[in-house]
């Protein structure tokens, strides 16, 4: 089972694209190191306070994949500098 989550977020403290990318890189790197998922920025790459990223997880069951994605989203929510506004989930 493949689970995919697309998240749109606001980065309030980013005053430039450079600051946005520094915050985003730190978060994405920590997610990749802690969880067995793929994550990448997929939208709003030239907008300095908004971002959209995709997270993909693969496992043998939907329940396990859903739990992994929920843990990743909770971990992302623990960062005070980013606020998740919209999340869409798909299953393949």
UniProtKB/Swiss-Prot annotation:
Gene name of the encoded protein: ylxP
Domain of life where this protein originates: Bacteria
Protein name: Uncharacterized protein YlxP
Disulfide bridge positions per record: none
InterPro entries: DUF503, TT1725-like_sf
Pfam families xrefs: DUF503
SUPFAM superfamilies, per the entry: Hypothetical protein TT1725 (SSF103007)
């Amino acid at each position: 089972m493949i689970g995919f989550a697309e998240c749109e977020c606001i980065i309030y403290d980013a005053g430039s694209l450079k600051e946005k990318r520094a915050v985003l890189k730190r978060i994405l790197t920590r997610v990749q190191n802690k969880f067995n998922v793929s994550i990448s920025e997929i939208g709003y790459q030239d907008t300095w306070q908004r971002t959209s990223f995709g997270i993909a997880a693969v496992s043998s069951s939907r329940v396990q994949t859903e739990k992994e994605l929920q843990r990743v989203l909770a971990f992302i929510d623990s960062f005070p500098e980013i606020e998740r506004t919209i999340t869409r989930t798909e299953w393949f």
